[in-house]
């Protein structure tokens, strides 16, 4: 069985996730950012959409409020962050200090920027495979993230 959760605050803003019904879902909806925390017994994924003009300090505080970077969890942060990686802002510095590594290494947007990010705990970065694929319905690439099974046991 599967279900769908979404967080959105307007046209062309928001995030959606398909998930197994046994997953725990929490949604944060602010005007300039939205995220869904998707958690199973094996993995925790934060799926984000960040609008231009976002207060990254406020976003980081929201991530903390939703227990981002619990060292006991296998945590990933993915999404359209609307800044070119590697970035030089409060969020990118927070993730670096928290020992997360940005895994996307080539442009994901038609303008030639890396706007879609995947952050993984550095200790698990060798267990992740990233594949880009072009989609006809978006100006962003589709990104497939594969996690090696031994990482979630």
Question: Would you name each region that the model predicts?
Answer:
Residues 1-3, 102-103:
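Conserved active-site segment immediately N-terminal to the catalytic lysine
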Residues 2-3, 45, 119:
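Generic preference for hydrophobic
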Residues 2-10:
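A short, structured active-site edge motif that brings together acidic residues
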Residues 9-15, 107-117, 139-141:
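RNase H-like two-metal-ion nuclease catalytic core shared by retroviral integrases
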Residues 17-108, 124-153:
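Active-site regions of metal-assisted phosphoester/phosphodiester hydrolases
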